[in-house]
């Protein structure tokens, strides 16, 4: 399973309208490439995709900057749910949403017949992976901070919820492969 879900870019970006413009794809265009690239790198090519989408709010309020408090029209779906079947017959459910206030799910968690893995945030391309190969879920941490693209490189908090001085941020590296 894979999930990207939060309230939307209007909470931290002073000009969020392009993410919500007609035919711009909302969270699919914003975050989908990071998640889908990680899944393809882990599981191989997809052979079938089924999906649904919806728009929850007709308008949103800008939460920061000189236009703070202004309303703008939402012209694209803001929540997408898909099932992806890969060539190796793995089946993944993915949620990409700008409509979730809060959640505690892992970004990507994969289950197999020999174990499970929790993959670090594909948006930042850094952080530990957690693996369980025993019944009952004893999870082992596999740190990546000693790997070339796992070293912590954030000097100070940028006010984004997913960035902190304790994680690596090599955003876009996965996409460039």
Regions inferred by a protein language model and the residue ranges of each:
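Glycine-rich phosphate/pyrophosphate-binding beta-alpha loops
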Residues: 95-103, 169-170
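Short acidic, gly/pro-rich beta-turn/loop elements at beta-sheet edges
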Residues: 10-12, 59-61, 92-94, 104, ...
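Predominantly a Rossmann-like dinucleotide-binding segment in NAD(P)-dependent oxidoreductases
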Residues: 1-73
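C-terminal glycine/acidic-rich active-site capping loop/insertion
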Residues: 58-75, 81, 85-86, 106-109, ...
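Acidic/polar loop patches that form or flank catalytic/metal-binding clefts of enzymes
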Residues: 45-51, 91-93, 116-120
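Beta-strand secondary-structure signal
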Residues: 1, 81-83, 91-95, 109
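Glycine-rich beta-alpha junction loops
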Residues: 3-8, 53-58, 88-90, 98-100, ...
């Amino acid at each position: 399973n894979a999930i990207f879900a939060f309230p939307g870019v209007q909470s931290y970006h002073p000009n969020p309208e392009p993410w919500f413009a007609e035919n711009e794809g909302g969270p699919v265009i914003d975050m989908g490439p990071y998640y889908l690239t990680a899944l393809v790198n882990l599981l191989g090519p997809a052979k079938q995709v089924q999906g649904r989408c919806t728009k929850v709010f007709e308008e949103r309020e800008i939460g920061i900057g000189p236009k703070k408090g202004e309303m703008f029209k939402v012209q694209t779906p803001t929540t997408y749910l898909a099932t992806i079947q890969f060539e190796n017959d793995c089946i993944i459910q993915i949620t990409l949403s700008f409509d979730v206030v809060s959640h505690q799910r892992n970004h990507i968690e994969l289950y197999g017949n020999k174990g499970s893995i929790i993959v670090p945030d594909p948006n930042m391309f850094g952080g530990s992976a957690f693996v369980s190969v025993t019944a009952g879920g004893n999870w082992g941490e596999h740190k990546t901070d000693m790997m070339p693209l796992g070293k912590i490189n954030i000097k100070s908090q940028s006010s984004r919820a997913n960035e902190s001085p304790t994680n690596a941020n090599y955003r876009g590296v996965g996409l460039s492969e």
